[in-house]
């Protein structure tokens, strides 16, 4: 979902469009509950919760829903929030690799549904570690260009810990260590620069370019996985050219 990937750019646009869907809201709420359970209800002392809440607010989750999720997760309502994080690894078309991040209250259900979605859509489950080494955990901020140059963005965020700024065509993507993400957001705010999304993601060290057929199959696989309630995120090293993107959009 990162780098100069056409899939990444499409995904971030899709995330904004889909932000009002109930499924998207449920996943954001689940993130908040887990972060509050792990680190407590205080945003100032819980960076994971602060990130989860910021993301939820950015995608228009109502404040009441957010507050209730924090209280549930922190155990202030008497409800038990018991989710397990699981990462599955898979191979897709033409040598592409996928990491499937799950948050579930039923490990058997998650395993069954993920495996079924992969096998039905042309992928194969990979052994633990055989795919994950291709990715690094990074803070990733996506922002529209709005007339900005790459140097403008870099100057705004360099002292906040930014490692690089990538040009994705219509947008820029800032990479940092996960812990520097709040400082990056604050630096952008101070510079008057608006951003679309900020995430902690698994970023591929190298990308695999797919042709039209491979990209079509890959999108089918990725979409099937993301439709699953237990799947929070899908990361991949798949990429495709402008020509392949245009061909897919014309179908």
From Swiss-Prot:
- Write down the superkingdom of origin: Bacteria
What UniProt keywords are attached to this protein's entry? Cytoplasm, DNA-binding, Transcription, Transcription regulation
- GO BP terms: regulation of DNA-templated transcription
Q: Which HAMAP family match?
A: Transcrip_reg_TACO1
The terms under GO molecular function for this entry are: DNA binding
Please indicate if the UniProt record lists Lyase as a keyword: no
Which family does the record claim for this protein? Belongs to the TACO1 family.
Looking up InterPro entries in the UniProt record yields: Integrase-like_N, TACO1_YebC-like_2nd/3rd_dom, TACO1_YebC_N, Transcrip_reg_TACO1-like, Transcrip_reg_TACO1-like_dom3, YebC-like
Query: Any keyword Amino-acid biosynthesis?
Result: no
**Location in or out of the cell:** Cytoplasm
Q: What is this protein called?
A: Probable transcriptional regulatory protein Achl_2034
Q: Which GO terms describe its cellular component?
A: cytosol
Annotated Gene3D superfamilies: 1.10.10.200, 3.30.70.980
């Amino acid at each position: 979902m990162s780098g100069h990937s056409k899939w990444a750019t499409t995904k971030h646009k899709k995330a904004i469009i889909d932000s009002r869907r109930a499924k998207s809201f449920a996943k954001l709420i689940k993130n908040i509950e887990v972060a509050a359970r792990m680190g407590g209800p205080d945003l100032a002392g819980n960076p994971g919760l602060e990130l989860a809440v910021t993301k939820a607010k950015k995608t228009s989750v109502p404040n009441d829903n957010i507050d209730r999720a924090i209280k549930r997760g922190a155990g202030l309502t008497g409800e038990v929030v018991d989710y397990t994080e699981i990462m599955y690894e898979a191979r897709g078309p033409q040598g592409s690799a996928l990491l499937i991040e799950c948050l579930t209250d039923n490990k058997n259900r998650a395993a069954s549904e993920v495996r079924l979605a992969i096998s039905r859509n042309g992928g194969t489950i990979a052994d633990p570690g055989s795919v994950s080494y291709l990715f690094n955990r990074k803070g990733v901020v996506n922002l529209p260009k709005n007339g900005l140059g790459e140097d403008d963005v870099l100057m705004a965020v360099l002292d906040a810990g930014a490692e690089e700024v990538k040009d994705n065509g219509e947008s820029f993507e800032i990479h940092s260590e996960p812990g520097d993400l709040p400082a990056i957001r604050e630096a952008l705010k101070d510079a008057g620069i608006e951003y679309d999304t900020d995430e902690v993601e698994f970023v591929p060290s190298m990308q695999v370019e797919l042709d039209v057929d491979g990209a079509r199959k890959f999108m089918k696989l990725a979409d099937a996985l993301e439709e699953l309630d237990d799947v929070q995120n899908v990361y991949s090293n798949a990429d495709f050219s402008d020509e392949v993107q245009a061909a897919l959009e014309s179908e």
